[in-house]
Amino acid sequence: MTEENQVTAQEEAQTPFELQIQRIYIKDVSFEAPNLPTIFHQEWKPQLGFELDTETKQLDEDLYEVVLHINVSTTLEDSGDTAFICEVKQAGVFTIKGIEGIQLAHCLASQCPNVLYPYARELISSLVNRGTFPALNLSPVNFDALFMDYLQRQEAEQNAEAPAVN
C-alpha cells in the first residue's frame, strides 16, 4: 500500500458520523370528525387505534427525505361510532454522512423518525384539541426497538426461504 493510499484509508476510517437536519415540514395532514356534534352526547369511552410507518427516499448524495406516517383513529366503545380520524405525514430532509449499510438503515429508520415524532405528536394533539375532544397525549415510540424487530423479521423470512440442507 502506498503512502497516499494509507492516508486515504485513514481519512475514511476517521470520517465522523454526521446527521444534520436540513428541513422539517408537514407533508400531509387530515382531521375528520364524521359524527360531530351528536357524538358529544355519548359517554366518552374511547378506543384508540394507532398506526405508524416510515418512508425514506434518497434525494441526492448524503441527502435523504424521511416521512413519518401516523394514523390515529378513535371510536366510542359503546356505540362504535367514529369520534375522529387524524392522519399526519411529518417529513424531514436530512444530510447523513460517514455511515453506510446497516448503520445508514438504522439512522433512517430510527434516529430520523425520533427527530420527527415530537413534531407529529404535537400536531396530532393540537388537531384533536381543535376538534374539542379531550386531550390526546401519544406515548413515546422506541424506534430502535421497532428497527430491531424489523431486522429479526427479515432474518426469519430469509431463514424460512433458505432451502434445507441435509
Curated annotation (Swiss-Prot):
Chief location of this protein within or outside the cell: cytoplasm
Q: CDD domains given for it?
A: Translocase_SecB
Q: Which SUPFAM superfamilies match?
A: SecB-like (SSF54611)
Q: Which domain of life is it from?
A: Bacteria
Name the keywords, alphabetized: Chaperone, Cytoplasm, Protein transport, Translocation, Transport
CC per GO annotation: cytoplasm
**Gene Ontology terms for molecular function:** unfolded protein binding
Places the protein is found? Cytoplasm
A biological process from GO: protein transport
Function recorded in the entry: One of the proteins required for the normal export of preproteins out of the cell cytoplasm. It is a molecular chaperone that binds to a subset of precursor proteins, maintaining them in a translocation-competent state. It also specifically binds to its receptor SecA.
- What is the annotated quaternary arrangement, including any partners? Homotetramer, a dimer of dimers. One homotetramer interacts with 1 SecA dimer.
Q: Which family does it belong to?
A: Belongs to the SecB family.
Matches recorded under PANTHER family: PROTEIN-EXPORT PROTEIN SECB, PTHR36918
NCBIfam families to which the protein is assigned, alphabetical: PRK05751.1-4, secB
Q: By what name is this protein known?
A: Protein-export protein SecB
What are the top taxonomic ranks of the organism? Answer: Bacteria, Pseudomonadati, Pseudomonadota, Gammaproteobacteria, Pasteurellales
